[in-house]
Amino acid sequence: MAATFPGVCAVVPAAGFGRRMQTECPKQYLSIGNKTILEHAVAALLADARVQRVVIAVSPGDRRFSQLPLAQHPQITVVDGGAERADSVLAGLQALPEAQWVLVHDAARPCLHQDDLSRLLSLCETSRVGGILAAPVRDTMKRAEPGKTAIAHTVDRNDLWHALTPQFFPRELLVDCLTRALNEGATITDEASALEYCGFHPQLVAGRADNIKVTRPEDLALAEFYLTRSRHQEKA
């Protein structure tokens, strides 16, 4: 399968700091077990043989990445990221001219499951636009009054999904959409939103809800629990 699969590479934007973690260390460099969150995230991508190369966009002047064993991996390339996520992703894409399809994965999302990644990668066989891992909303959703904490109304959760990563698109399409969206001042919160802005409709690929992003201090313990459970299941 790997011999006929189109060229797939990945970009991991890792130039952010994550101030909500309330630590002096950028969250992607916090440790879970004997690896950083970033190392867990990248290892999940490289575990699939179809992913040929991973470009990691770090903050200019970052001194932490070069100290990781990951920095010497033959399939890893590091580039300087930008002020915003979209700038970092574009910098990564420019370093991957050979890629036909590109995964974009959060540096702080260490719990990606291989079966989810495999289903997402299969999109390149059926889609011209690509798609994202996502999880259906299960909780009751409330919208607050503007600028307040008072409830304005309950939001119908039918057809609502939590956007996850990786997100997976044809490289040229993603470059074009990100460039246009940035040039026109659009608000881009993830790569799919750039495609949406340009009139495309990526697919939602159901993924596991435990593919969490470490954003707040309490997320670190939860991610450690999920990773430990996953290792135990693999050994069983």
From Swiss-Prot:
Residues the record marks as site: Transition state stabilizer: R20, K27
Site (Positions MEP for the nucleophilic attack): R157, K213
Keywords: Isoprene biosynthesis, Nucleotidyltransferase, Transferase
GO BP of this protein: isopentenyl diphosphate biosynthetic process, methylerythritol 4-phosphate pathway
Pathway named in the protein's UniProt entry: Isoprenoid biosynthesis; isopentenyl diphosphate biosynthesis via DXP pathway; isopentenyl diphosphate from 1-deoxy-D-xylulose 5-phosphate: step 2/6
GO molecular function annotation: 2-C-methyl-D-erythritol 4-phosphate cytidylyltransferase activity
UniProt cross-references to InterPro entries, sorted A to Z: IspD, IspD/TarI, IspD/TarI_cytidylyltransf_bact, ISPD_synthase_CS, Nucleotide-diphossugar_trans
Catalytic activity field: 2-C-methyl-D-erythritol 4-phosphate + CTP + H(+) = 4-CDP-2-C-methyl-D-erythritol + diphosphate
One Pfam assignment: IspD
EC numbers: 2.7.7.60
Superkingdom assignment: Bacteria
Function: Catalyzes the formation of 4-diphosphocytidyl-2-C-methyl-D-erythritol from CTP and 2-C-methyl-D-erythritol 4-phosphate (MEP).
Subunit structure: Homodimer.
Family that this chain belongs to: Belongs to the IspD/TarI cytidylyltransferase family. IspD subfamily.
Protein name, as recorded: 2-C-methyl-D-erythritol 4-phosphate cytidylyltransferase
Organism: Klebsiella pneumoniae subsp. pneumoniae (strain ATCC 700721 / MGH 78578)
Lineage, opening ranks: Bacteria, Pseudomonadati, Pseudomonadota, Gammaproteobacteria, Enterobacterales
Gene this chain is encoded by: ispD
